[in-house]
């Protein structure tokens, strides 16, 4: 993300701060020594796998599945999962919590604010069609602040 010129440095810093504040154990340290021993189709992705190994992660959630082949990740008991599949699985496990999280997320969006329909349309554009197919019938349950 740091090399993505469409994202302003301030936005990246805001996301980093929010992740660190709200996601327990979101910062993994001490993984650097693992990087050189890893082989992935894109060498610039090795730090992601190294952090997953160091952090004892079971899953790497990424749109970039081609650069995280499960055949290679299997040796580390890690799997790569598309965000649409990951979110859909979470919904199947606990739909109520996912609806609550969606509601909190929608209500946190202020500039511009989103209706439930606009929010779901945005998720659809972000390549999350299966997840949206679960949420759309429940959109009337999403209360806006």
What is the predicted role of each segment?
Residues 14-20, 35, 55, 68-69, ...:
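Short, functional N-terminal and low-complexity linear motifs
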Residues 65-145:
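Acidic, PIN/NYN-like endoribonuclease modules and their adjacent C-terminal/linker elements
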Residues 24-59, 93-94, 113, 126-145:
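Active-site neighborhoods of divalent-metal-dependent phosphate/nucleic-acid chemistry enzymes
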Residues 45-79:
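Acidic, metal-binding active-site segment of PIN/NYN-like and related structure-specific nucleases
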Residues 1-31, 105-127:
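PIN-domain endoribonuclease scaffold, especially VapC-family toxins
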């Amino acid at each position: 993300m740091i090399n993505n010129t469409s994202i302003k440095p301030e936005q990246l810093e805001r996301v980093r701060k929010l992740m660190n504040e709200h996601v327990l154990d979101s910062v993994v340290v001490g993984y650097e020594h693992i990087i050189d021993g890893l082989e992935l189709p894109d060498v610039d992705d090795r730090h992601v796998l190294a952090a997953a190994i160091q952090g004892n992660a079971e899953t790497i959630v990424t749109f970039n599945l081609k650069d995280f082949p499960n055949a290679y990740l299997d040796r580390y008991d890690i799997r790569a999962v598309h965000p649409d599949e990951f979110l859909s699985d979470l919904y199947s496990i606990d739909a109520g919590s996912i609806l609550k999280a969606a509601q909190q997320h929608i209500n946190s969006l202020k500039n511009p604010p989103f209706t439930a329909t606009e929010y779901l349309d945005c998720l659809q554009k972000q390549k999350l069609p299966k997840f949206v197919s679960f949420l759309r019938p429940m959109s009337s349950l999403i209360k806006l602040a």
